[in-house]
């Protein structure tokens, strides 16, 4: 089975994405506040951490997103493809109003692809397949 994943930036409503990065690693952090050993708030996706292969030296879009504190929309897409059939199992993580609050550049000496970017993202809304999570702390109104 082949496993392909990408970080894409663009318009989720139209499905048009202008920038695509190869995803190496992804962590979705979920949380809900609890009181007296019981949850007392709705679940929210607290943050998304991704590692992507660093693009060429002329593509500074990810650094500019971090430095300018702009909001972006896009998605993380995971494709699990079987070599024996044409079926594709897909998981989709869409984000709206996302900001990059942490940016790291990593260099690895002993592997084929040596340069990576690690991003931490917080978004006003994250939808995983058909389940939506709103993060009130990420919006400007909070």
What do the PLM-derived regions correspond to, one by one?
Residues 1-142:
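Glycine-rich, low-complexity intrinsically disordered segments
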């Amino acid at each position: 089975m082949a496993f392909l994943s990408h970080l894409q930036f663009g318009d989720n409503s139209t499905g048009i994405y202008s920038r695509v990065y190869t995803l190496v690693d992804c962590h979705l952090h979920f949380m809900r506040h609890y009181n007296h050993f019981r949850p007392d708030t709705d679940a929210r996706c607290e943050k998304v951490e991704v590692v992507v292969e660093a693009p060429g030296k002329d593509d500074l879009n990810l650094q500019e997103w971090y430095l300018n504190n702009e909001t972006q929309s896009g998605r993380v897409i995971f494709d699990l493809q079987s070599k024996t059939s044409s079926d594709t199992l897909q998981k989709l993580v869409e984000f709206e109003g996302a900001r990059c609050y942490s940016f790291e550049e990593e260099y690895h000496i002993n592997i084929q692809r040596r340069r990576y970017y690690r991003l931490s993202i917080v978004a006003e809304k994250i939808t995983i397949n058909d389940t939506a999570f709103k993060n009130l702390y990420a919006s400007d109104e909070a």
